[in-house]
């Protein structure tokens, strides 16, 4: 009896784009042979808003409220790099108290960023319960931000050239220490619930392995780089703000798989708590803003045919003049190296404002990681990268 041969042709599957509040508007064109992934092509750009061009047509004070829309899980990091760029270009010093306040806000944002990564990542691999836990803890961080800045999730508009917009209110530091005490126990609870769970371990161990050489060659940063055994943290390398005043460790893992990246992020939350405790205990007195940096310099005069005269019908507002020159500034966000290349032309607006988003670079390795894996592993690998499409597309 003759048997019919079965031939299977590759199937092309579109994953996404989804709503920005979910996994984001990332579209993956996946080529499948049965359950195996042959090829993957990421399609980006659905959330492009021209942030760099907007920055080149705004003064720094006007642009700071915009920047929370890059990475809407890490608004404080975006504000920090936006004011750090002209600060470094113009050599504007920051008072010690303002630097401590900035560090506290950045580390709170690092915890909030890792929490918002942790919940959806675990939901993707089948653990639904922690997804609800993380919002309970993030709510307390929102309360602290609301007390200090007036806003909760994004658009805090708190960082300024030379300092911060306002000093911390009375009793805020005590509330922050109370949060650290509360959250320390919650991280222990997460680890008991998740880390040694056999189902979770089988879903993420040995999946999406990135070697040390691959991580360096693909220019990865943040937990993606440290999860492959590279001890590289810009808080230690660049010595920005006042991180050298505190005792903390750079967390690494050697395996390079999804589980290693999970462990790095969970342990980084513990290190952030250590930094916040030390900053709250040792914060000095003094001004929260460099008053010399507030000096106003009038911009160029309006021409009758110029766009500012025709459409705004007033002269350019007095504000900081960005001196001529160019500079690259970077910091360690929750996702990796967030950088800005700024080029000034002795005007109130930068001539060039290039944003180096960490998740844009980290996303490049996804097609290589997905080749040969099963369909069920796609979300585990993509989730371990920690991508926010507002930051990728800008």
From Swiss-Prot:
Its EC number is 7.1.1.-. Its main location: membrane. InterPro entries: NADH_Q_OxRdtase_suD, NADH_UbQ_OxRdtase_49kDa_CS, NDH1_su_D/H, NiFe-Hase_large. It is found in: Cellular thylakoid membrane. Gene3D superfamilies: Cytochrome-c3 Hydrogenase, chain B. It is a peripheral membrane protein. GO terms for molecular function: NAD binding; oxidoreductase activity, acting on NAD(P)H, quinone or similar compound as acceptor; quinone binding. It catalyses: a plastoquinone + NADH + (n+1) H(+)(in) = a plastoquinol + NAD(+) + n H(+)(out); a plastoquinone + NADPH + (n+1) H(+)(in) = a plastoquinol + NADP(+) + n H(+)(out). Pfam families: Complex1_49kDa. NDH-1 shuttles electrons from an unknown electron donor, via FMN and iron-sulfur (Fe-S) centers, to quinones in the respiratory and/or the photosynthetic chain. The immediate electron acceptor for the enzyme in this species is believed to be plastoquinone. Couples the redox reaction to proton translocation, and thus conserves the redox energy in a proton gradient. Cyanobacterial NDH-1 also plays a role in inorganic carbon-concentration. NDH-1 can be composed of about 15 different subunits; different subcomplexes with different compositions have been identified which probably have different functions. Belongs to the complex I 49 kDa subunit family. This is NAD(P)H-quinone oxidoreductase subunit H. It comes from Synechococcus elongatus (strain ATCC 33912 / PCC 7942 / FACHB-805) (Anacystis nidulans R2). The gene is ndhH.
């Amino acid at each position: 009896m003759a048997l019919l041969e079965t031939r299977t042709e590759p199937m092309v599957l579109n994953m996404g784009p989804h709503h920005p509040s979910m996994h984001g508007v990332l579209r993956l064109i996946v080529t499948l042979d049965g359950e195996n992934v042959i090829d993957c092509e990421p399609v980006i750009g659905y959330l492009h808003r021209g942030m760099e061009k907007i920055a080149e047509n705004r003064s720094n004070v006007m642009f700071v409220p915009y920047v929370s829309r890059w990475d809407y899980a890490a608004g404080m990091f975006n504000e920090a790099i936006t004011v750090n760029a002209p600060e470094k270009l113009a050599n504007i010093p920051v008072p010690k108290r303002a630097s401590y306040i900035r560090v506290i806000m950045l580390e709170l944002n690092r915890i909030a960023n890792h929490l918002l990564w942790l919940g959806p990542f675990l939901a993707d691999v089948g653990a639904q319960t922690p997804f609800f836990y993380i919002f309970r803890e993030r709510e307390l961080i929102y309360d602290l931000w609301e007390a200090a800045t007036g806003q909760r999730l994004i658009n805090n508009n708190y960082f300024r050239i030379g300092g911060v917009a306002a000093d911390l209110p009375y009793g805020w530091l005590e509330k922050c220490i109370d949060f650290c005490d509360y959250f320390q126990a919650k991280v222990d609870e997460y680890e008991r619930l998740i880390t040694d769970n056999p189902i979770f371990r089988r879903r993420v161990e040995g999946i999406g392995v990135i070697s040390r050489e691959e991580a360096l060659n693909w220019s990865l940063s943040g937990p993606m780089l440290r999860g492959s055994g590279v001890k590289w943290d810009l808080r230690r390398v660049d010595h920005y703000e006042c991180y050298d005043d505190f005792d903390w460790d750079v967390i690494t893992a050697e395996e390079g798989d999804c589980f290693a990246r999970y462990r790095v992020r969970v342990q980084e939350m513990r290190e952030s708590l250590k930094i916040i405790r030390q900053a709250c205990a040792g914060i000095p007195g003094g001004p929260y803003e460099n008053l010399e940096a507030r000096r106003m310099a009038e911009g160029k005069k309006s021409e009758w045919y110029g766009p500012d005269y025709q459409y705004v019908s007033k002269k350019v507002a007095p504000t900081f003049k960005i001196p001529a020159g160019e500079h690259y500034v970077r910091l360690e966000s929750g996702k990796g190296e967030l950088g800005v290349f700024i080029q000034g032309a002795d005007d109130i607006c930068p001539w060039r404002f290039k944003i180096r988003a960490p998740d844009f670079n980290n996303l490049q390795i996804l097609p290589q990681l997905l080749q040969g894996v099963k369909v069920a592993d796609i979300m585990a690998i993509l989730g371990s990268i920690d991508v926010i499409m507002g930051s990728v597309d800008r």
